[in-house]
Structure formats: C-alpha cells, structure tokens
Amino acid sequence: MDLRALIGVIEIPDLKKFLPEFILLLLAFILFTLELFIKGKERRLVLNVVSYVGYFSVLMSLLIPWMYKGDTFYGNFTNDPLAVTVKIFAVLITLAILPFASSYFSAKKSFYGEFYYILAFTLLGVFVLASTYNLIILYVALELVSVGFYILTALLRGSTEAKEGAFKYLILGGLSIALASYGAAFMYIYSGSLDLREILTYQGKDIHYLVLGLVFFLIGLAVKIGAVPFHYWVPDAYQGAPTPVTALMASVGKLAFFIPLVRVMPLVQEKFSLVWTITVGVIAALTMLYGNLVALVQKDVKRLLAYSSIAHSGYIMAGAAVAKVIGMKAVIYFLVAYAVMSAGAFLVLALMEKNPEWQNYMENFYGLRFNAPYIAFAFFVYMVALLGVPPTVGFVGKALVFMALSFDKLWWLAFIMILSAAISTGYYIRLVVVMYMHEREKEIRSAPSHLGEKFSLFALTLASVLLGVLPSLVWFLIKQSAENLFTG
C-alpha cells in the first residue's frame, strides 16, 4: 500500500486540545520521579511546590478560548462547554484541598509522597471522563478515577477504619465497573457502536438489548455516585479515608461520576423519556429520604456528612429525572454547588483533626465558636448552604431542581424533595445550635492553620455565599453546557 495514501486517510488528532491532560500526565510522572529520588525534609516542600505549579498550569490551559471548540481523536474526545466547566471546577477544588492534605499528614506524623502523584493520575481520569462518549475510554477513565480513590482511601496504613472503608469501596466499586461493562456489551450488540451518541440514536429492532444495556450501565453509575440501594460503601469509605481525601471524593469524585449520567440525559428523551423519568425519579426519592433519615441519628459528624452526601446525590438525581434543558441546567449547577459546599465542610473537619485530642463526635462541637470562631463561622456557612437556606449556593441549587420538577409536572418528586429537605433541618440546625448556643463542655482548640488553609477556607466560604447571591457568575458556563448538549 502507498504510504502516502495511508497517511492521507489517518486523522491526526488536534494535540492542543489534549494540553490539560498532557500537563496532568507529565505532572504525575514528575511527582512520581521526585518522590522516588528526593529524600529528607525537602521532599514535602518540593512535591507541594511542583503540584501547585502543575495544577495552576492546567488551570491556565483550560482558560484558553480554543479549548471550548470541537471534537478530536476521531470524535472520541470532546472539549465541549460541559467538559471544560467540569475540568475548571475540578482543578479549583483540588487546589483548595491541597494545602490541607500536606498539613493533615504532617499532623498525623506521617508523610505519604504517593498522595501527590496518585492525586494527579486521579484528576487525569476525571478529565478524560468529562470529555468522552466512547464506552471503552469511559471504562478506562472510570477505572483510573476509582483505583486512585481506592488507594487514597487506604492511605493511613495504621488505620483499621481506612482499610475497612477502602475494602468496601474496592469490592462495590469493582462490581459497579463490571455491571457498567456488561451494560456496554449489550449496547454494542444492539448498535455495533461504542459511541453513546450513536447507540442511543440508532434505530435497531432488538431494542431489548439497548434497554438491558442501559439498565446495567446506569446501575454501575448509581454505585459510583452512592445512590440508594447501592450506597453501602459511602459511609465507611468517607469515614475511614483521610479527611482531605474524603473532601476530594465528595466534591471532585461526585462531579466526575455524574458526568456520564448527564451526557446520557439528552439522548434518552426521544425513546425512553417516561421510563427514564420514573426509574431515575424513584431512585432519587429513595436516596433523598434514606440519606436524610439516617443522617438524623448519627453522632459522628464525618459519618453524618457522608449520609448527607448520599441525600445530595438524590437531589441531583431528581434534577436528572427531568431529561430536558431545564433539568440539565439544574443538575450541572447543583453539582458545582455541592462540590464547593462539601469540600468546605470536610476541610473544616480536616483542620480540627490536626489536634490529636479531637474526635468528630457531636459533643466536641459544643461551644466551638469560643475555641475556634472563624472555623465555626465557616462550618456554619456550609451547614446552612447544605440545608438550602437563602442566599447560599445550596438554596439556588435546590430551587433550580424544584423549578425543573415543576416544569415537568413531577409534583410527587417535588414533594419528596421538600420533605427530605425538611428532615435534613434536624441535623444541620442541630450542629449550628451546639456550636453557637451551647457552652463548651471541654476545651479542645483547633491546631494552628497556615496561610494556604486559611485562604482555601475563605475562598470556599465566600463561594458558598457569592454563587448564591450572584449565580450569574457561573450561569453562562452552565447554560452553555446544557444547551450545547441538547442542540449539539
């Protein structure tokens, strides 16, 4: 064969569209090499500095205008507005978490250099997951993110809780990947394609293969996002993991694992609109109610926030039940909102846990405003935001979901959402009350926080309020992301 003719039919990928991913991959290998060869006290400093430089470089590359345009790699990799929005917020939240991770492990009198390069590889998986419709690439990205979280959950080697949480996460996470792969196989049998867009628009006769494949695929995703009844790994993994890792899983992890579900939404409205609404709506209702009811009886605040995370998966799924533009706008906004709120809430716990006397039990929060006033205020903001009190970002998120449900006349699901939010008042307000209206039972002061931690906490607290007062700051990205998916 004429080599020139062969080259003529080969599409050369537009490599500049992979720039953020290339930077992340390079960062991961640099951190891996540095961790191997640099010893002594300077290792922590070098890994931190290189990480900050790398993530800021990734962020800058995402702000270049051409990142928003078109597909590449034979249509298997897309840099549409949704992908870029997810990547920007994933990097920003990772940068907010990074200062806490270093000081947290230092306070535990241990240093895990592998945290830095595993974090970079995990974020690379998030980026790829946000940018593909191809089932094989989706599988690889899901595995990359999942394996990263399995390892990070078990990072505290001396902790039995960490090992137990990581083991449960590994077993159920492996099951979810298997189910999603099984579903992908059925979808391929139906359509002969690995592209979700082609699969769900294909007019084939054996539609039962498509239905079966879609069911298995969605069950696999439901495990990842912690939806009921596939949520069993969430409380133990969140409680056992190092708290900065928990913040990462609750924010960036949830943001990433919801993206395949978001990309499927416009594709199901023609063939499966009613079935989709009922199925996703029922799972959302169960998830909202269960998460909030079980959170009511928790004494450990970290575990309470884990059940709150389950409940918020339900709120987001309620928006996803409306497979229309208005539903997608609500879902994307709520994902961003929850990422900000949950990261902040867990990072407050990470800050308190630096004190060896601190335990995350409710009684230790009594009179926290006396011991750590600015930390108590930040935690207060996150609690009212998670509850959905105006003018916080959580209120806007829940209002958008309620509007989407009302638009689609899903009054039964809207009622369950309001009921669930009312139930959640019990534990969010209880935390606020014990911090501000009870005297301290014993003096447990927070460990000193450095400038990076203070800035991150300030930024997340400000964002929790500012994005509620001025949602227009991010609305352009969210509106463009949703409308682009429905109009192509």
From Swiss-Prot:
<comment type="subunit">
    <text>NDH-1 is composed of 14 different subunits. Subunits NuoA, H, J, K, L, M, N constitute the membrane sector of the complex.</text>
</comment>
<protein>
    <recommendedName>
        <fullName>NADH-quinone oxidoreductase subunit N 2</fullName>
        <ecNumber>7.1.1.-</ecNumber>
    </recommendedName>
</protein>
<keyword id="KW-1133">Transmembrane helix</keyword>
<feature type="transmembrane region" description="Helical">
    <location>
        <begin position="45"/>
        <end position="65"/>
    </location>
</feature>
<keyword id="KW-0812">Transmembrane</keyword>
<feature type="transmembrane region" description="Helical">
    <location>
        <begin position="242"/>
        <end position="262"/>
    </location>
</feature>
<feature type="transmembrane region" description="Helical">
    <location>
        <begin position="458"/>
        <end position="478"/>
    </location>
</feature>
<feature type="transmembrane region" description="Helical">
    <location>
        <begin position="169"/>
        <end position="189"/>
    </location>
</feature>
<dbReference type="GO" id="GO:0008137">
    <property type="term" value="F:NADH dehydrogenase (ubiquinone) activity"/>
</dbReference>
<keyword id="KW-0874">Quinone</keyword>
<dbReference type="GO" id="GO:0042773">
    <property type="term" value="P:ATP synthesis coupled electron transport"/>
</dbReference>
<keyword id="KW-0830">Ubiquinone</keyword>
<feature type="transmembrane region" description="Helical">
    <location>
        <begin position="274"/>
        <end position="294"/>
    </location>
</feature>
<comment type="similarity">
    <text>Belongs to the complex I subunit 2 family.</text>
</comment>
<keyword id="KW-1278">Translocase</keyword>
<feature type="transmembrane region" description="Helical">
    <location>
        <begin position="331"/>
        <end position="351"/>
    </location>
</feature>
<feature type="transmembrane region" description="Helical">
    <location>
        <begin position="18"/>
        <end position="38"/>
    </location>
</feature>
<dbReference type="Pfam" id="PF00361">
    <property type="entry name" value="Proton_antipo_M"/>
</dbReference>
<feature type="transmembrane region" description="Helical">
    <location>
        <begin position="308"/>
        <end position="328"/>
    </location>
</feature>
<keyword id="KW-0520">NAD</keyword>
<keyword id="KW-1003">Cell membrane</keyword>
<feature type="transmembrane region" description="Helical">
    <location>
        <begin position="110"/>
        <end position="130"/>
    </location>
</feature>
<dbReference type="GO" id="GO:0050136">
    <property type="term" value="F:NADH:ubiquinone reductase (non-electrogenic) activity"/>
</dbReference>
<keyword id="KW-0472">Membrane</keyword>
<dbReference type="GO" id="GO:0005886">
    <property type="term" value="C:plasma membrane"/>
</dbReference>
<keyword id="KW-0997">Cell inner membrane</keyword>
<feature type="transmembrane region" description="Helical">
    <location>
        <begin position="81"/>
        <end position="101"/>
    </location>
</feature>
<dbReference type="InterPro" id="IPR001750">
    <property type="entry name" value="ND/Mrp_TM"/>
</dbReference>
<feature type="transmembrane region" description="Helical">
    <location>
        <begin position="210"/>
        <end position="230"/>
    </location>
</feature>
<feature type="transmembrane region" description="Helical">
    <location>
        <begin position="375"/>
        <end position="395"/>
    </location>
</feature>
<comment type="function">
    <text>NDH-1 shuttles electrons from NADH, via FMN and iron-sulfur (Fe-S) centers, to quinones in the respiratory chain. The immediate electron acceptor for the enzyme in this species is believed to be ubiquinone. Couples the redox reaction to proton translocation (for every two electrons transferred, four hydrogen ions are translocated across the cytoplasmic membrane), and thus conserves the redox energy in a proton gradient.</text>
</comment>
<dbReference type="InterPro" id="IPR010096">
    <property type="entry name" value="NADH-Q_OxRdtase_suN/2"/>
</dbReference>
<keyword id="KW-0813">Transport</keyword>
<feature type="transmembrane region" description="Helical">
    <location>
        <begin position="135"/>
        <end position="155"/>
    </location>
</feature>
<feature type="transmembrane region" description="Helical">
    <location>
        <begin position="412"/>
        <end position="434"/>
    </location>
</feature>
<dbReference type="GO" id="GO:0048038">
    <property type="term" value="F:quinone binding"/>
</dbReference>
